[in-house]
């Protein structure tokens, strides 16, 4: 019986070593991105924006890019610290509100001006274009993947159904950001700043009379149960205000990715990704509003005349902002005009 020839020992060892090296190289190509944000895992943004974005990136990279998600500040810190966590490399990606750091993003916050935006799907790509054109210096150390706004802030009131400007006088209302504080002050309310998760309990206990929030976040906060009245601008008119959001990645982490994985990140970033993010925010409005309707909550739609009064009352916010940033060498009027023009040009 003829025995099969035996493979020499050294070639077998070499082949095994090469196989292990190839496997190690493949493993090295796999990157897990730590993604941190401040909303609950049941929130619209987590379920319908961040998770799908991560799934798409994983699929298009053939599994080489994966996200490890940390909602609700699970990695510690506070929401205003998220941007620096990404910049410093504590995490790889964050979804955050840049303007939670008052005064640090003066160019970005122009999109939070009163009565500037109506639909997030239109305003969000405009915001991305605006930042790329005018405000990248505010994002040193990170790569903005996409930016967006919410579906528009309205007033969710605990017991008082605000119908006229005078009704707001002296009421304590939660403000989301620095400009939100100024807007509420201009309307006659007493602005109170607090984190989003604290709002429902604050209204329930009477710490505040209401909150300036979008419908998009209302359901995860159960605002429809806590607030009894909702104050909105008429259809076709810009909302009282909005908030700017950004998904940003540590620049060094991005720069260290293989070219093929950078392409995947790039394909899921930019103007169209921002438009999609805005669409996700807008899509949450109708279902959230319906929950409040089904509960029999009161809805107040400001009349055209009353809306005009609110717009006039908050015009000083625009003027004050322009003067403030101009004193820092920033052409505030040009930035505000550009923001309006970029929103108008969107389909």
Feature roles, as predicted:
Residues 1-10:
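N-terminal secretory signal peptides that target proteins for export/translocation
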Residues 2, 29-122, 137-347:
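N-terminal secretory/targeting leader peptides
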Residues 12-25:
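Bacterial N-terminal signal peptides
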Residues 125-132, 137:
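Signature of the catalytic double-stranded beta-helix
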